[in-house]
């Protein structure tokens, strides 16, 4: 290994260790309800969420009630994300005109995202609308990570309390994880990514003319945008001469930031952080790796 490589690794661990104490102090104050510096900004939004959702923030839950609330929330998220994928062809923010995601793939993706699983069976840039990417996948990147953080905090409360019939309030832990921890960190990281060239736009794909035409096999799709299969179940293709290339863009930075902070493997592009529109410079690469280890 080169000296430069060792220096980069050393710098990474130095920055990570330097952030452990202040971030840990901050998170402890968030979960114990103490002033943490973001109260004036996020406090009104937190109270508004409680009022709208009918949550009594001072009401404690035992472990059974906590578990039921967690399961109910995530099952609702599973259904919502599945329906969003199936109906995306009829919904706005779909400049490329993508049709509905196949039922099995929609369920696969929904179950993956609500469980914060590092799994991706889709190519987002060629299959999902901007609305699905934002309202579906990005939202689940936040709340699935917040769910895991809430459960860990509840476990810590249960282990550290000598005698306690309650372990907190799931809705409060979920809300505070999102508003006070994940959202501010994601906003800062997204701005850094955009400053380095990560894409963030509602514009449709850009088309550029190739210097030399390329012949390739293109899948044949039906009116719904699904592959047409032959008698053996394989996708039918046709030879096509390509003279231009579509460069997929979209609201990328906002999703990439929480994807790495929440350690959820589903990204905007099929190649994830190996794609130059997600991870264009050495600085963004460093920041994304740091984000993955920062909370986890």
Locate the predicted segments by residue.
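N-terminal alpha-helical transmembrane segments of multi-pass membrane transport
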Residues: 1-108, 129, 152-153, 160-168, ...
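Alpha-helical transmembrane segments
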Residues: 8-16, 133-146, 248
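Hydrophobic alpha-helical transmembrane segments
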Residues: 68-78, 141-150, 288-296
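P-loop potassium selectivity filter motif centered on the GYG triad
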Residues: 89-137, 200-290
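Mid-bilayer segments of alpha-helical transmembrane spans in multi-pass integral membrane proteins
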Residues: 106-121, 138-146, 150, 154, ...
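Helix-loop-helix junctions and helix-breaking kinks within/between transmembrane helices
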Residues: 156-157, 287
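Short, glycine/acidic-rich beta->alpha junctions
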Residues: 163, 282, 294-295
């Amino acid at each position: 290994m080169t000296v430069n490589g060792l220096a980069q690794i050393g710098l990474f661990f130095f920055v990570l260790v330097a952030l452990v104490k202040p971030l840990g102090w901050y998170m402890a104050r968030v979960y114990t309800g103490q002033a943490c510096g973001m109260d004036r900004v996020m406090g009104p939004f937190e109270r508004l969420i409680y009022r709208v959702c009918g949550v009594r923030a001072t009401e404690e839950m035992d472990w059974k009630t906590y578990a039921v609330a967690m399961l109910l929330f995530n099952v609702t998220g599973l259904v919502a994300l599945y329906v969003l994928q199936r109906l995306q062809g009829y919904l706005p923010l779909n400049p490329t005109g993508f049709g509905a995601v196949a039922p099995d793939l929609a369920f696969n993706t929904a179950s993956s995202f609500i469980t914060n699983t590092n799994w991706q069976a889709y190519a987002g840039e060629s299959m999902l609308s901007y609305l699905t990417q934002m309202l579906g996948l990005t939202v689940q990147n936040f709340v699935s990570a917040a769910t895991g953080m809430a459960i860990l905090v509840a476990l810590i409360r249960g282990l550290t309390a000598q005698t306690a019939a309650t372990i907190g309030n799931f809705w409060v832990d979920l809300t505070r994880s999102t508003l006070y921890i994940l959202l501010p960190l994601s906003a800062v990281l997204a701005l850094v990514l955009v400053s380095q060239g990560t894409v963030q736009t509602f514009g449709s794909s850009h088309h550029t003319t190739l210097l030399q035409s390329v012949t390739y096999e293109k899948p044949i799709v039906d009116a719904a945008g699904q592959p047409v299969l032959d008698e053996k179940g394989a996708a039918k293709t046709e030879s096509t001469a390509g003279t231009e290339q579509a460069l997929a863009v979209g609201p990328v930075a906002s999703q990439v930031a929480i994807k790495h902070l929440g350690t959820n493997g589903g990204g905007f592009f099929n190649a994830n952080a190996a794609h130059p529109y997600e991870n264009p410079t050495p600085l963004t690469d460093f920041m994304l790796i740091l984000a993955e280890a920062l909370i986890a």
